[in-house]
């Protein structure tokens, strides 16, 4: 996934009411506590006395895999306890921010996309890792895993890439419902849609065959984060950043000027108007939507690889589904999901009183061995190519996911590698954002679709320009031209010119 999209992913999280966040923080109890810690050869600075590492993430379906790592870690380091707290995803940024302010931050935490990583560094949330992350340790990772402006700032390393390059969203197809609607080839194999028009035709056929009880398409946006996932069909249709709206080829936001976004709204609202989308879409959450899909309530769902481990837990008998890349507007993809040098995963808190133990756990989670177990558990790809072998897939849907992941990513430009001061430009969020606009369109509160997109584009462009001007006023050398890479071909890997 491009770092531009990651930046937008949890943006809405900071909008949660502070009072509600305080209540949630006070009432949240660790969901998993498994003993784990220092080895016979204890890391420097860590005593052999019992130590407890506070670990935060927002992973639910990935939880059992992390629990297994805690168990294995404990077997090797019996004096350390990893106390894991799994927070609610849409509250996570607020809860972490409140913990930082209160001085009660976890020792190790999964880094959220909001605030931006550079802002978290500036706020002093993260501990530099250089004293442990030696050249030898860095060499265990693929080339370009550590990059200035991504996970390194002013020469200091703050995190390591966790996920491997992969489209973070795919289309899941309920094979049983497709077969019931006759959407199969001559051999009886399900014909999964490749284009938007094929999606719409399939959705109509499935809804008709369901007689009012089954629908072609579904999602769950109760937590107000999933509507933009539907918009991600633009990511393979000519939008380099379908979630954030910024286009490096233009050096500006293109919500209105790139016609693909309005094309998608017409397509999606057309499906809604035809009655092909599950009616409860705005009142159920994503986890409920996944159960609906597994129990045959609707036939097509956008989601990530976490769906598969989730179904293994909630609907263990459900295996009759397929995984394909996100359908595109035309016959071929006009763009892809993108990656760039560097990457983000876990971080060690600057407030930790047990930095050596926290690093030990950080290093364990970022080892090749743990990465291989992650892939074998069906949790997705990791940064280490040797861990991402198709032979590790234990089910056909997971093998399909791995194939989609291995084929569906391209390298994007990384102007921040050439101009590190770009990370000092921090645009303010404008509201309503794309989530709010899509919700307004979906509920018919917004009727001028193009006007709403143009307004968002203008507001985002103005925020970007203001942030650049603010950085310049602080004496930071930044040039608006750095945000423009006109020679980027969206269908090919970009070779960074002048990269060191």
Predicted regions and their residues:
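Conserved N-terminal structural module of periplasmic/extracytoplasmic solute-binding proteins
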Residues: 2-123, 135-137, 185, 192, ...
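Extracytoplasmic/periplasmic substrate-recognition and gating elements
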Residues: 49, 72-76, 102, 155, ...
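Short helix-initiation/N-cap motifs at beta->coil->alpha
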Residues: 86-95, 194-198, 281-291
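Extracytoplasmic/periplasmic solute-binding protein
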Residues: 153-165, 169, 179, 197-253, ...
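Glycine-centered hinge/linker elements that transmit conformational signals in sensory
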Residues: 198-204, 244-282, 322-329
């Amino acid at each position: 996934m491009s770092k531009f999209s990651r930046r937008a992913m949890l943006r809405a999280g900071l909008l949660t009411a502070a009072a509600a966040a305080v209540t949630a923080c006070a009432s949240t109890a660790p969901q998993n506590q498994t003993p784990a810690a220092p080895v016979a050869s204890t890391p420097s600075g860590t005593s052999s006395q019992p130590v407890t590492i506070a670990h935060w993430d927002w992973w639910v379906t990935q939880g059992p895999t992390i629990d297994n790592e805690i168990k294995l870690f404990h077997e090797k380091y019996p004096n350390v306890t990893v106390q894991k707290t799994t927070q609610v995803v849409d509250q996570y940024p607020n809860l972490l921010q409140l913990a930082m302010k209160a001085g009660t931050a976890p020792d190790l935490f999964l880094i959220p996309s909001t605030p931006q990583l550079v802002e978290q560094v500036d706020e002093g949330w993260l501990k530099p890792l250089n004293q442990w992350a030696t050249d030898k340790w860095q060499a265990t990772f693929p080339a370009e895993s550590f990059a200035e402006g991504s996970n390194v700032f002013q020469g200091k390393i703050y995190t390591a890439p966790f996920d491997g390059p992969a489209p973070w969203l795919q289309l899941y197809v309920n094979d049983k419902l497709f077969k019931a609607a006759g959407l199969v080839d001559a051999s009886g194999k399900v014909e999964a849609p490749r284009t938007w028009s094929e999606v719409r035709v399939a959705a109509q056929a499935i809804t008709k065959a369901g007689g009012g009880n089954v629908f072609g398409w579904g999602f769950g946006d109760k937590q107000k984060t999933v509507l933009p996932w539907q918009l991600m069909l633009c990511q393979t249709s000519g939008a380099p950043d379908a979630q954030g709206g910024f286009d490096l080829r233009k050096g500006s936001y293109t919500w209105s000027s790139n016609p693909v976004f309005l094309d998608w709204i017409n397509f999606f609202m057309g499906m809604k108007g035809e009655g092909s989308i599950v009616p409860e879409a705005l009142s159920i959450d994503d986890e409920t939507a996944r159960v609906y899909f597994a129990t045959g309530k609707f036939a097509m769902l956008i989601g990530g690889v976490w769906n598969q481990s989730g179904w293994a837990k909630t609907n263990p008998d459900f295996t009759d589904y397929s995984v394909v890349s996100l359908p595109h507007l035309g016959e071929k993809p006009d763009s892809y999901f993108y990656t760039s040098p560097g990457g983000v995963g876990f971080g060690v808190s600057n407030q930790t009183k047990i930095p050596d133990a926290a690093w030990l756990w950080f290093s364990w989670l970022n080892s090749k061995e743990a990465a291989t177990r992650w892939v074998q558990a069906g949790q997705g790809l990791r940064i280490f190519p040797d861990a991402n072998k198709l032979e590790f897939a234990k089910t056909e849907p997971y093998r399909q996911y791995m194939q989609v992941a291995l084929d569906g990513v391209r390298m994007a430009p990384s102007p921040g590698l050439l101009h590190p001061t770009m990370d000092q430009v921090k645009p303010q969020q404008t509201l309503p954002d794309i989530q709010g606009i899509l919700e307004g369109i979906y509920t018919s509160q917004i009727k001028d679709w193009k006007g709403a997109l143009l307004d968002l584009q203008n507001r985002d462009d103005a925020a970007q320009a203001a942030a650049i001007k603010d950085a310049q006023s602080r004496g930071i050398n930044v040039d608006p031209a750095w945000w423009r890479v006109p020679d980027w071909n969206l269908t090919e890997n970009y070779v960074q010119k002048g990269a060191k």
